[in-house]
């Protein structure tokens, strides 16, 4: 690992941090250390990093803004790539835009609304990066990323990079081909939007933001929705029906605002969150015979 670190420092690929606590890089403020955390300065740097990682046959993981993510207490072995400011480029060409995987979803939605471009209003208030949003087909208010994506540039596990069309992404509810069939990371994406009245777009976005503020605990350290909705049921409603709102294990607490959110109430460990997730799953299965599957990504070395 020392040789790899020195090579990456010499190649000037961006910021290279050793034994970096990932709690500093997740919205839940939980997570053990990464052996090496690298914040690449651009897409070319990502390619260089991957060449060195493959040469050293080192494990690698990619994160974005750390939302929708639970990093385990022992952290992550090998290299963690954090896609941030180095991959937050944006090009607007009429109704088609190209945006980096590290670009903030909220920032993009706001920027496009000011230009009268409609299609991303549903994302107002969604934390996280474009890369993560495409990876999991993020959505809200009856729409999702699959409705507007044209294609995405993907870094695959073997280090190769290629463009995948919307059809090739094989989108479904909160999933894409990148999660299991062809594991990969979104470096940039192309979206097709529509011109519309700016005032109308801004009003719709504000309504969506207000709804989130009123119903979801984004002022507390959390990872967004913990469970996928077991349609036609809704995860949050099932948790509330089971009278679990406010239930706490260690430092992890089911939000008093929304049953599908677990907040870090202070000093929570990943194990606290896992224990609470398993408790909820068991309770809902016993009471309603419904399987609850996690939406939050759980990564890292297990205890």
Swiss-Prot record:
The active site is at residues 174, 225, 295. Pfam families: FAD_binding_4, MurB_C. The lineage of its organism: Bacteria, Bacillati, Bacillota, Bacilli, Bacillales. Its cofactor is FAD. Residues 30-196 form the FAD-binding PCMH-type domain. Pathway: Cell wall biogenesis; peptidoglycan biosynthesis. This is UDP-N-acetylenolpyruvoylglucosamine reductase. Gene3D superfamilies: 3.30.465.10, UDP-N-acetylenolpyruvoylglucosamine reductase, C-terminal domain, Uridine Diphospho-n-acetylenolpyruvylglucosamine Reductase, domain 2. It comes from Bacillus pumilus (strain SAFR-032). Belongs to the MurB family.
């Amino acid at each position: 690992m020392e040789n790899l670190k020195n090579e990456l420092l010499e190649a000037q690929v961006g910021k290279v941090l050793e034994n970096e606590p990932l709690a500093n890089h997740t919205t839940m403020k939980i997570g053990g250390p990464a052996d090496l955390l690298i914040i690449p300065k651009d897409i070319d740097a990502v390619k260089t990093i991957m060449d060195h990682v493959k040469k050293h046959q080192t494990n690698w993981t990619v994160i974005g803004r750390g939302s929708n993510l639970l990093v385990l207490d022992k952290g992550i072995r090998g290299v963690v790539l954090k896609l941030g400011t180095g991959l937050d480029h944006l090009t607007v060409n009429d109704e088609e835009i190209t945006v980096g995987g590290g670009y903030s979803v909220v920032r993009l939605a706001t920027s496009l609304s000011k230009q009268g471009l409609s299609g991303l209003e549903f994302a107002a208030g969604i934390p996280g990066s474009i890369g993560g949003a495409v990876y999991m087909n993020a959505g809200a208010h009856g729409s999702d990323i699959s409705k507007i994506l044209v294609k995405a540039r993907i870094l695959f596990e073997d280090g190769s990079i290629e463009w995948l069309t919307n059809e090739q992404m094989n989108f479904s509810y909160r999933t894409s081909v990148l999660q299991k069939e062809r594991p990969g990371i979104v470096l940039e994406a192309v979206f097709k939007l529509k011109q519309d009245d700016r005032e109308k777009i801004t009003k719709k976005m504000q309504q969506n933001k207000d709804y989130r503020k009123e119903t979801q605990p984004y002022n507390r350290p959390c990872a967004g929705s913990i469970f996928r909705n077991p349609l036609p049921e809704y995860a949050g409603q099932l948790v509330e029906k089971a009278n679990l709102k406010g239930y706490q294990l260690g430092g992890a607490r089911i939000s008093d605002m929304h049953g599908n959110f677990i907040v870090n109430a202070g000093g929570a460990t990943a194990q606290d969150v896992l224990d609470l997730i398993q408790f909820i799953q068991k309770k809902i299965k016993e009471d309603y015979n419904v399987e609850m599957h996690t939406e939050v990504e759980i990564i890292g070395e297990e205890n």
